[in-house]
């Protein structure tokens, strides 16, 4: 794969892989402004994609992004799809709208929507803890419902890809298979909830690749880098982050690591979309995986519970099927 500097920007990543953008269809979740998803969408618009679909809760949040895309290139088709990942009825409706709008052909799905370290214990409509719901379970359902469209594009020269945005926060906790919703809140911890959800997204990427790689679809889990410019952690204060290290140690017995190699502790807003874009576009990655990306490259997760293990991967898949009430077999 192409090697980039640790300070590579989203713009540079798109420029390097412009042929892998031109004429292709991308679906991005959670791309309200400002967010990692919106930065990715706006940069992709510079390289002449055929269609950018942004799935988010409210049109108001996405309108500035659609406007920015059209300013980049008025010929790029940009579509808003209403999606509430915490409501499975909404996910199913959104999937049908996306399939119709794309004529059942999607080249790249980027699952970038999410929430982080919510202080108040909350359940979604289905009774699932809200961080697990939005970060993982809703995306699991959406991705599987869109898989027929990904398989159609899998026949193209570049294949099809799914990018799950995870976080170094995965280190905080493994998936709590026997108690994903914290005993109705009695044992809830906001960072543990975030950690298990981000671990689940890694295991999901592994599981999807296991099932579909031979048919031309691969999924990668990506930590985009830490950044304070998006709305993701806007409800937190710096003291909240002091709980990350002891919570990780308590849950896993391991130390928490913020970076790998020469990765900056914080990436700029211009850099924050680069790693997922590299994973989505680099043609040398076709047929590769399962894999986890950080700092623009494939790395081994530092936490034992996120290293590929088929038993754990399949266990997460089965749990996710139970939570959405539907089996997906390929």
Where are these regions (language model features)?
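SDR active-site lid
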Residues: 210-288
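Residues at helix-coil transition
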Residues: 46, 280-284, 325
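Non-transmembrane alpha-helical segments in soluble domains
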Residues: 147, 205-209, 276-277, 317, ...
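Residues within well-formed alpha-helices
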Residues: 61, 130, 275-278, 289, ...
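Short, amphipathic alpha-helical "lid/cap" segments that border enzyme active or binding sites
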Residues: 92-95, 269-280, 310-317
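Rossmann-fold NAD(P)H-dependent dehydrogenase/reductase core
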Residues: 3-239, 330
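C-terminal tail/cap regions
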Residues: 6, 256, 285-330
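Active-site rim elements
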Residues: 188-195, 259-266, 303-308
